[in-house]
Structures are given as structure tokens and as C-alpha cells.
């Protein structure tokens, strides 16, 4: 370096300093880029699947509420029997399909047996279980109501036996809305066959939903299996950690003093 006239040394130029103190970051390898890209893409897919499953469970919850309103309407004066049963069949079929899809999606995003569990997944398990329990209960209600009305209708048929005039007057005043007293015997037989078919279909769907509920409880995460119903409503906001099942070999003896 050359000295300045006043005795000070010259500082290196900007270009020289940049060349001397140049700090370059090592370029990312292709594997690093792939790992970063695959990680973010996997997280995005998981979140999207979680949102889809959440929306599906909410729609199934709405469908269960609609079916419950239809079951309550059985026997209402303003509701026609054929149209009500057709609407119940349509709503019940759609609800069963939603329940199957929700169970499949929830089982797919649940993950392996060990590891962290997202709290939202736990809540979806609880919501789906409650909806399925209510769904099967409402199906059982509809079976009982339709069966009782059909039994009441058979008792009023000509072959059902003779009744006193007072009983006939009382029954005519208490005739359910689903019954058409002016129908012919052929119409009565057809109506009875249709109601029996609806009851059989409802029983079939109820058995299917009960089996689905059993599968849901079997595939439920371990933290949910190990907790009671009261603690399920107060889940921690932090990810839950699955615990391995402890296996005990041999016998456990109790010794009393």
C-alpha cells in the first residue's frame, strides 16, 4: 500500500474491499430444494385434506339435523305420508354416504400409530362419533313410529275384527295423519307394503351406521380412547402425542399382607 502525503495509509477501494471481504453463501443442493418443496407441499396437502374433512363432517351434521326434523314430522297433519317417506329415504341415503366419506377421509389424515395428533383431528373424531350416534337413534325412532302407525292401520282394516261403535268414533277422532281412512283395500295393502319396505331399508341403514360407528371407535386415536367423555370436550390446543400400547407378559399377582 502507498502512503499518502500526510502520512496516512490509503484505504483499499470499494471494489478491492468487496473482493477481499466477499462472503458468498454456498448454493443449495438439489436435495435440499427437493426436501423443502416436498415438506411444504405435504403440509399443504394435509391442511387441505383436513379442511375438506371438516367441511364434510359439518355437512353430515346438517344432514342429521334435517333427518331429525323429518322424523319429528311423522304423524303431523300437514305432512303427506308418501312425500314424507320419500324425503326421509332421500335424506337418509345422502347422510349415509356422507358418513362413509367422512370416515374414510378422517382415517386417511389420522396418520401413523405413533407421533403427534392435530387437535382438530381429535375434534373431528368426536363430532363424527356424536353425529353417528344421533343418526342411528333417529333411525330407530322412525322405525318405531312407522311400525306403530302401520300396526294401528292394520287394526282398522275389515279383517282386523269387529269393534264397538264408541271405539270406532274415538279412533276416527284420533286417526294419525299418515292414515287415509277413505283408501280402498288394495291401496291399504300397497301402503302397508311400502311402509314395510321403508322400515326394512331403515333397519339396514341403521345396522350399517352402527358398524361404521364401531370402526370409528376402533380407529380412534389412542389419546381419545384413554380419556373419558368429560375430558374429550377440553382438548389441549397443543398437538397430542400418541403413546405406544404397553404389553405385559406373564401374570400380575397381588400379594396381601
Swiss-Prot record:
Residues 32-45 have a biased composition (Basic and acidic residues). It is found in: Nucleus; Cytoplasm; Cell membrane. Keywords: Cell membrane, Cytoplasm, Lipoprotein, Membrane, Nucleus, Palmitate, Signal transduction inhibitor. The keyword Endoplasmic reticulum does not apply. Residues 180-192 have a biased composition (Low complexity). Residues 1-45, 174-196 are annotated as: Disordered. One of its GO terms (cellular component) is nucleus. A lipid is attached at residues 252-253 (S-palmitoyl cysteine). It is a lipid-anchor. Palmitoylated. Undergoes rapid palmitoylation turnover. De novo and turnover palmitoylation are both mediated by ZDHHC2. Palmitoylation regulates the cell membrane and nuclear shuttling and the regulation of GPCR signaling. Upon depalmitoylation, it is targeted from the plasma membrane into the nucleus. GPCR signaling inhibits depalmitoylation and promotes localization to the plasma membrane. Regulator of G protein-coupled receptor (GPCR) signaling. Regulatory subunit of the R7-Gbeta5 complexes that acts by controlling the subcellular location of the R7-Gbeta5 complexes. When palmitoylated, it targets the R7-Gbeta5 complexes to the plasma membrane, leading to inhibit G protein alpha subunits. When it is unpalmitoylated, the R7-Gbeta5 complexes undergo a nuclear/cytoplasmic shuttling. May also act by controlling the proteolytic stability of R7 proteins, probably by protecting them from degradation. Interacts with 'R7' family proteins RGS6, RGS7, RGS9 and RGS11. Component of some R7-Gbeta5 complex composed of some R7 protein (RGS6, RGS7, RGS9 or RGS11), Gbeta5 (GNB5) and RGS7BP. The nuclear localization signal is both required for nuclear localization and palmitoylation. Belongs to the RGS7BP/RGS9BP family. PANTHER family: R-SEVEN BINDING PROTEIN (R7BP) HOMOLOG (PTHR21029). This is Regulator of G-protein signaling 7-binding protein.
